[in-house]
Amino acid sequence: KNHARKVVTMELQTKMVPVRSREGHPVLTGPQAMPGPSATYIAYGKSWANVSNTPFRHYKSKNHEGGISTPLIAHWPKSITAKNELRSQPGHLIDIMATCVELSGASYPKTYKGNKIQAMEGQSLTKSFAKNVNVDRLLMWEHLHNRAIRLGKWKLVAVSRGEWELYDMEKDRTELNDLSKEHPAKYEELKALWEKHAHRTK
């Protein structure tokens, strides 16, 4: 019942899009879901938590698709001419700031009160509003020792301190066929990139 209530609430909130600003102009709205159901395995067990994210594996806190894949709805009639269309290229929460900065015409600050501000690592999503954009970008995740790195169609992912698994996301987004042994060079390449990123951000 708890999960059903959340689904109904989400549907009702989605119907509130579009939202207009106080001046009466259309604005960009993006209801992005939290990654995976909230504390689901605590409420009704790990098996049902997996069911909630079917066909993807795992759930919130993990970096398989069941834990990180979330919908984003963009609605801005004045600037987005595409209607009721889907986009399949990967994005990340870090892209939201870059998107808002570009759409608003603002400039991202380099300093604040004399302190240097780290440059944005996200990329604006505005190009994807018009069409699907295929970008071989590097994305990484880590949460509670759950790790993942994605480059183009390849994704390397591990649960906790377990072994890495390699997946071709174009053919196997459900992450069922580990290709680590079939593509050892790609496995080692992504693993090395992950270690470099982990060292930079520790």
Question: What residues fall within each predicted segment?
Answer:
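C-terminal cap/loop subdomain of S1 sulfatases and analogous C-terminal strand-loop tails that border
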Residues: P37-I68, S79-Q89, L93-K171, K186, ...
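Histidine-centered active-site microenvironments of extracellular/periplasmic hydrolases
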Residues: K1-H75
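A non-catalytic, amphipathic alpha-helix used as a structural packing/dimerization or gating element
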Residues: E182-K196
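Active-site-proximal N-terminal segment of extracellular/periplasmic enzymes that hydrolyze or transfer
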Residues: N2-V7, N177-A185
